């Protein structure tokens, strides 16, 4: 593979049972541009225990001594609410001495562990890293910067440095619309209007006064509806369980979601029918396979019986007939002599005379 080939990749890391994990966690290793990478997270912060920290780590032995890579990368914390992912990213250089870069203050732990914020789902956190390695590898002595030169505060920080320099936060679709007290991104405005038109009493008993909480609940509702609109093939049983949890949360918050509960019950029934149908289909396929094997076995036995029947039907040749007749006569003669001897000398003499000897 050419060293000048630009390579990029996306890696997803799912942290199961987040609440029981140790403070420092490493992801499995993944490879980009011939180098081995992994993600490193500090659940209680690398330096500040109020924040969740995430870093991208390059295996030191992946690059020859005196060389370094220029990399553009981003790290995303998935959120169940649309357009609310936490994304930080930017360019930096990796070498043998500075092989870990990332974000000390990635996200407030208080916000991360709050279920209403949408980052933790069933005690599971999903982190996505996008790594873009630029084409050239440059010798370190050609790109060394003056140590006295200040660093741009909009660059990512190396984990070995004393200060934390945060990359720019990537935000998509910043335009928002206020619909009946719910502020949503413009791309979701039409969906919210349709929900409120068809179910005008959905938020009559909603007790949330905080604007951020109101927005989070509406985004939660939109995300739930989008999930339920997937095909049965895409929907897993785990998705349906999570939908149940989401409905309970919305109902407890004061949303009237009876109509959505009915839809979810219908989905569950259809999913059960699908699973039962797939089970029956699998059973029929297994039975059919056994019948096919039995058919092949019977076909083989049939051919064997046909061959044996043809052999049995074959007529005797003249030589076969003579040999068999002579053998039969000799057998009869020997039997008569043996019988005569056992009956006594007189009968034996008679049989001997009848044999032509006088």
From Swiss-Prot:
Give a single Pfam family match: MATH_2
> What keywords does the record list, in alphabetical order?
Coiled coil
Keyword Magnesium recorded? no
Q: Where is the MATH domain?
A: 8-131
Q: Cross-referenced SUPFAM superfamilies, in alphabetical order?
A: TRAF domain-like
Coiled coil keyword on record: yes
Residues in coiled coil? 250-309
Q: Highest taxon of the source? A: Eukaryota
Q: Which InterPro entries match?
A: MATH-CC_domain_protein (IPR050804), MATH/TRAF_dom (IPR002083), TRAF-like (IPR008974)
Query: Which Gene3D superfamilies is this protein grouped with?
Result: Apoptosis, Tumor Necrosis Factor Receptor Associated Protein 2, Chain A
Matches recorded under PANTHER family: MEPRIN AND TRAF-LIKE DOMAIN-CONTAINING PROTEIN-RELATED, TRAF-LIKE SUPERFAMILY PROTEIN
Name of this chain's protein: MATH domain and coiled-coil domain-containing protein At3g58440
Ranked from the top, the taxonomy reads: Eukaryota, Viridiplantae, Streptophyta, Embryophyta, Tracheophyta
